[in-house]
Amino acid sequence: MLPRSINILKLRPTTQVTTTALRALATEAKTTLGATPGSTSTSTSTSTATTTTLESTSTSTSGDATETTIKETKSIKRKRTFFTDELNKGPSFDDFVSGKAKDMLEDPLELARKDPNAKLPLWLKVPIPKGKSFHNVKNDVRELKLSTVCEEAKCPNIGECWGGKKSEATATIMLLGDTCTRGCRFCSVKTNRKPGKPDPMEPENTAEAISRWGLGYVVLTTVDRDDLIDGGANHLKETVQKIKFKAPQILVEVLGGDFRGDLEMVKILANSGLDVYAHNMETVEALTPHIRDRRATYRQSLAVLRTAKETKPSLITKTSLMLGFGETDDQIRQTLKDLREVGCDVVTFGQYMRPTKRHMKVVEYVTPEKFDYWRDVALEMGFLYVASGPLVRSSYKAGEAFIENVLKKRKHNVGESPRMLQEVKPSIFKRA
């Protein structure tokens, strides 16, 4: 029970209350409660109440009445100060004076700055994109309202591809918009069940952009459009034909989807006039369900490559595998065997790099030496050409010159030695 001396809430109106008096009463109550035995629960609750800061507002007197307002100041939660806290854990002034600071193995200030997810091996670091050619390509893409896989998929080679000389600068155009109907766990392209309708001017604008760049070899890629009846096959066909009409000398590679397993759509694209039919396996069979969208299957992708080759045997068929998901050597070898069985001519190996924290983590950063090993293994198995390196991507322009050479020789009926093809190992893929 509270002592009468602090029962201030029932004061008579004529009583004059001052801030000093309130503080004195609170102090007296605290002392009294601390000395009263046998009242643990009461004293605890009262002590808690009396320790709350009491603030008496200015007293206004009207006649013989006095109105007193007591406010309880609520405790304010301290803001998070991670950087400051980490700094405080670091060397003190005395540590610097005594010289102990230099012996500390880790500086908490530096640890607070670093992002654990930003740590990459040296061979995966690339220069910041810049240069006149880079900005020219970027302006063309913006002006013609085109999407590129270089930007949408956050490709690390964008500076090299866009920033090359006039005869080399290129961008991989992404057709059917910038939004995919699928959601693979490795891909940073936007997803939506119902993307917008394809731009009817996209084929014409794509052909115009490519003709400006003066290229000999171009790569077109596409998002999956499961919302379209034909999966976008006829849109791709129209784009290829417009490019060939504007510049017949240009060799065209199309990296297409699986069209939900509709092989008739594969045949439409294969007969469109393209020169290289590409479709990516992405990973080994065991990991496919965990990495790719559930609508994409390993066997379905093999069927796409087989059908493209059977439809037009003169086509070069191409696929790509990403390493770093936790795949085993035996699984990779089996995948290469499966690819050779369906007549796949070209394979590329690249390192999976996590685009954002929302995507699956990297299990392993594969060394350049291991990439060289897989290049040699694939060439021994009979692939026409293999590009293998940490920064290699399926649409990476460095391999295009070699494939362009092969296609031109074929068109001029100049026979090439398979052994010669296998011995060519471009140093550009040995990136360090």
Swiss-Prot record:
Residue ranges constituting the Radical SAM core domain according to the UniProt record: 165-384
Q: Give the record's GO CC terms.
A: mitochondrion
User: Disordered: where is this region?
Assistant: 32-71
First-tier enzyme category under EC: transferase
Which residues take part in binding [4Fe-4S] cluster 2?
Answer: 180, 184, 187
Which additional comment does the entry carry?
A: This protein may be expected to contain an N-terminal transit peptide but none has been predicted.
Q: Which UniProt keywords apply?
A: 4Fe-4S, Iron, Iron-sulfur, Metal-binding, Mitochondrion, S-adenosyl-L-methionine, Transferase
> Any keyword S-adenosyl-L-methionine?
yes
Please name the Pfam families in this protein's record. LIAS_N, Radical_SAM
Output the NCBIfam families linked to this UniProt entry. lipA, PRK05481.1, PRK12928.1
Pathway assigned to this chain's UniProt record: Protein modification; protein lipoylation via endogenous pathway; protein N(6)-(lipoyl)lysine from octanoyl-[acyl-carrier-protein]: step 2/2
Protein name per UniProt = Lipoyl synthase, mitochondrial
The EC number(s) attached to this protein equal 2.8.1.8
The UniProt annotation places [4Fe-4S] cluster 1 binding at 150, 155, 161, 395
State its cofactor.
[4Fe-4S] cluster
Entry-linked PROSITE patterns: RADICAL_SAM (PS51918)
Record-stated family: Belongs to the radical SAM superfamily. Lipoyl synthase family.
- PANTHER family associated with the record: LIPOYL SYNTHASE, LIPOYL SYNTHASE, MITOCHONDRIAL
Catalysis performed (reactions): [[Fe-S] cluster scaffold protein carrying a second [4Fe-4S](2+) cluster] + N(6)-octanoyl-L-lysyl-[protein] + 2 oxidized [2Fe-2S]-[ferredoxin] + 2 S-adenosyl-L-methionine + 4 H(+) = [[Fe-S] cluster scaffold protein] + N(6)-[(R)-dihydrolipoyl]-L-lysyl-[protein] + 4 Fe(3+) + 2 hydrogen sulfide + 2 5'-deoxyadenosine + 2 L-methionine + 2 reduced [2Fe-2S]-[ferredoxin]
Q: Where is the composition biased (Low complexity)?
A: 32-68
Q: Where in the cell is it found?
A: Mitochondrion
Looking up InterPro entries in the UniProt record yields:
Aldolase_TIM, Elp3/MiaA/NifB-like_rSAM, LIAS_N, Lipoyl_synth, rSAM
